[in-house]
Amino acid sequence: MKQILRAFLFLLLFTATVNTAIADEKANVTKQGTVRGRIIDATKQTLPGASIYIEKLHTGVTSDVNGFYTFSNLDPGTYTVKVSYVGYSPVELKITIPAGRTLEKDVVLNEGVELQEVVVGGAFQGQRRAINSQKNNMGITNVVSADQVGKFPDSNIGDALKRISGINVQYDQGEARFGQVRGTSADLSSVTINGNRVPSAEGDTRNVQLDLIPADMIQTIEVNKVVTADMDGDAIGGSINLVTKNSPYKRTIAATAGTGYNWVSEKAQLNLGFTYGDRFFNDKLGLIVSASYQNSPSGSYDTEFVWEQDDDGKTYVNDYQIRQYYVTRERQSYSAALDWDINANHKLTFKGIFNNRNDWENRYRTTLKDLDPDGNATVRIQTKAGTPDNRNARLERQRTMDFALGGEHLFGALSMDWHASYAKASEERPNERYIDFQLKKQKFDMDLSDERQPFASPKTGSTMTLNDEFSLKELTEQQEDIKEQDLKFSANFKLPFKNGNKLKFGAKVVRKTKDKEVDFYEYSPLDEDAFMTNSLANTVDQTNKNFMPNNKYQAGIYASKEYTGSLDLNNASLFEKEQVQEELAGNFNARETVTSGYLRFDQKLTKDVELMTGLRI
């Protein structure tokens, strides 16, 4: 509470100082006027990043993500305004600024050059918006629009990000999950939604799973590779800002449907999307709602090897794994945005988004453990599964939500915006089960002629598939619950000067909580012989002729997911239960409050050169 009071006291004192300076500069400042409006095209689509320039004052601004622009602190009179936008014909118009009032002036731009002999059809409005926003941004920024994302079959934001220069991604089952900016670790960059940092449901890092958010729920992706003073100072690599859909200038209805087929799972995929937006009450109230649903059954074949060197410097494979995955990912996402234009000087906004991803995974794994240079190893056969209520699969349910209320206000020359938001991320992994069998002292012939595809062949009497020679290594189940919540309040002020310079200042308070709870249990059957008999009677053969190219590797026989999921582990007459105490050391409850403030000054040195300086504490 003390930090919050200090932040507001700082803002009040600074605002009072600025207002005093304005009053000293001109006694009759109340007679100055403001022009505010929106840049749109002929179809009433907003144009963010448009350049608006007042020739008489040699100063200009750019329209924001919703196409709005504002010139304040203008002497009454007539001005010539030039508006330009890549791909559109420039417009020049005259406006008359009233004394002490705000003039609302929307500007309509038309398509650029028209060819008579050659007709080219296409929709590049979003691409133009992205180019203009990128061109007029003072920082090192990449902007990707919705229609650019729509050109590719990207199901989530992570897959869309990988097409931006300077971004590389980490994959999980063929989908981009974590984004890395300029080669830095994923937890050294920030991911925000509409400027608010997304909480992380990862237990030990700040990584945000980008595949949570469907690509069709985002209007614009902004990648800031340089963090300026008015942005949160918690990113070294850069900041990825996801801008959700804003209320349109006119009624908008859109629906999408798609399907596909995965050859590993041999199942069809489904993608659905819907968007509705309109304005009401003489365009004072804007509304847009969107929904997205994706169901993607998939799978993968995987081989993994760990190489070592012996005392003589000879390389050999120490760990040899063959894996078969079956994964179904279901995404649901809902968003809504409201804006209410109270009058020309005051506006209220609300934005909310909810994302849910259910990830059901079964994994069958064969491991040659502690493989030595002579080919001796222990064979491990493992099945990953879950309980019947979770489709006998490991369920990972991740959710993120962000709800923000904000306002934009104009007090003479001073503009202000504020935001109060609540965000939450969570991950649940109930009843995650592993059943692991082992067979020791097995011998293999190792073919290491191809370093990318080393191959192990069992010698006589050895095996790599589950049979009655194996014994139970371990049977485990774990429950995991991770939650992170953020409460934020921020206020930002901007004061333009007649010479084109701008002063920005503001403060922000963030209250964060994060909790992690993991319970991990090991189970031992009271009658191991009967348990092994039942296990061998409930197996599944994962041998597949298309497992890998040239049929070189095969997965083999495993305990089935149905059998693993049906085990009555809490039955004391069948199993002995023991909690693994070492796993409890990773549990925690954390609380954090961060109070920050900043100053930023944009100075126009020449027509083509600007200097940006800033301080953040």
Predicted segments with their positions:
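Flexible glycine-rich, low-complexity coil/linker segments exposed to the extracellular/periplasmic environment
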Residues: D445-E474, E528-G586
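N-terminal periplasmic accessory domains that precede
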Residues: L103-V107, I157-A160, R177-Q180, T192, ...
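Predominantly transmembrane beta-strands of Gram-negative outer membrane beta-barrel pores used
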Residues: S190, T220-N224, S239-K245, T252-D311, ...
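Short acidic/polar hinge/loop motifs at secondary-structure boundaries
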Residues: S72, R197-K225
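Extracytoplasmic beta-strand/coil segments of soluble accessory domains associated
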Residues: G158-R197
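Short, acidic Ser/Thr/Gly-rich low-complexity loop/linker segments typical of extracellular
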Residues: L57-F68
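Short, acidic, small-residue-rich periplasmic hinge/interaction motif at the N-terminus
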Residues: D24-Q32, R36-Q45, A50-E55, S84-Y88, ...
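Transmembrane beta-barrel wall of Gram-negative outer-membrane proteins
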Residues: K267-T367, Q398-L405, G412
